[in-house]
Amino acid sequence: MEFLLEQISQITHGVVLNRIKPKILSEGAEYPILTISQLIDEENGVWDYEVPTALVDKKKVKNLNLAKEHSIVIGLTSFHRAAVLEKQHEGKIIPSNFVSIEFQNGIMDPYYFAWYFNEHPEIKRQRMIAIQGNSSV
């Protein structure tokens, strides 16, 4: 049986940080931000990195896309990989350079999905086509 990813999961684009800033500092709450460098550091066994924060308008907090344990993020810029978020990332803001995926009712193992997305030759080929012409300077 075949399913589209959107049929078995919630796919959410990360938030643009400038859109959640408070107009008045006293109306803001500080939240940690998930970054690509954190995920790369963790892949390389580095765990003592700094976690940047953002000031968020308190009225916008309830609509934030916050990281949850075992959800998946896919980097849309230089990372271009899927990563399963662990406990230490819970509550971090997922910024606009990521898409997050949460599977419904455990229908798919997030680690299997991340492995498949990152390692399957056909998916790699499709990713290369999608990012062709995009580069970081």
Show the residue positions of the predicted features:
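Short, basic/aromatic beta-hairpin or loop at an interaction surface
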Residues: Q38-T53
